[in-house]
Amino acid sequence: MKILIVEDDIKTGEYLSKGLTEAGFVVDHADNGLTGYHLAMTAEYDLVILDIMLPDVNGWDIIRMLRSAGKGMPVLLLTALGTIEHRVKGLELGADDYLVKPFAFAELLARVRTLLRRGNTMITESQLKVADLSVDLVSRKVSRAGNRIVLTSKEFSLLEFFIRHQGEVLPRSLIAFFMVWVHEFLTADTNAIDVAVKRLRAKIDNDYGTKLNQTVRGVGYMLEIPDA
């Protein structure tokens, strides 16, 4: 597995490179945004670890350009920017995970391995798929097991958010912030979140044996393929 690290702090970059190499990965390190973007566009990587506050091209712009170019490799944002606004922005731009500095290497390694083994979710420029649930981002058509599912615009956005973060526990507060940011139709009221998820679940899960949308009691929700 080949990983690209885009990190301008030399000590942090060397620390990450050494640790990931010892864990068995092939690692490239770019110490500026332009070089990192060029490498990500021209070479094949299984994962990109990307800082946001880079001296030339920032991480926000890099991930935006990568996704616009159809690059679908997992991206883990590693940054000192830790507010919920920053987290939501990163995830919405196309990041697959977000880790705030300072961090424990053991946690970063666990997140890296999780991202690399997500073989059940396929993400291309226009299609999202989990198990037998398919979402076409261009036509905005949703189907499960070949059956068409009609969603409202808000339900579609919520489903896309869940699929892009398949296997992650999403707190109600994060879902609320995301939906307000996109549609301005929810408050932080957890009941509103529960209602929105219940309506989505009724359409994508109720008529099927395998339930993809799971409740994590006391925390929030998660979209995943249950173990057989």
From Swiss-Prot:
Q: Which GO terms describe its cellular component?
A: cytosol; protein-DNA complex
GO BP, one annotated term: regulation of DNA-templated transcription
SUPFAM superfamilies reported in the protein's UniProt record: C-terminal effector domain of the bipartite response regulators, CheY-like
Domain Response regulatory span(s) in chain numbering: 2-116
Matching entries from Pfam families are given as:
Response_reg (PF00072), Trans_reg_C (PF00486)
Compartments (UniProt record):
Cytoplasm
UniProt key word Iron-sulfur: no
Primary location: cytoplasm
For this protein, the record's CDD domains field holds:
REC_OmpR_CusR-like (cd19935), trans_reg_C (cd00383)
Q: How is it modified after translation?
A: Phosphorylated by SilS.
Write down the SMART domains for this protein, in alphabetical order. REC, Trans_reg_C
A molecular function (GO) term:
transcription cis-regulatory region binding
Check the record and name the PROSITE patterns matching this protein: OMPR_PHOB (PS51755), RESPONSE_REGULATORY (PS50110)
Q: Which residues bind DNA?
A: 125-225
| Residues with 4-aspartylphosphate modification | D51
- Keyword list, A-Z: Cytoplasm, DNA-binding, Phosphoprotein, Plasmid, Transcription, Transcription regulation, Two-component regulatory system
Its function, per the record, reads: Component of the sil cation-efflux system that confers resistance to silver. Probable member of a two-component regulatory system SilS/SilR.
| Protein name (record) | Probable transcriptional regulatory protein SilR
Organism, by scientific name, is Salmonella typhimurium
What is the primary gene name for this protein?
A: silR
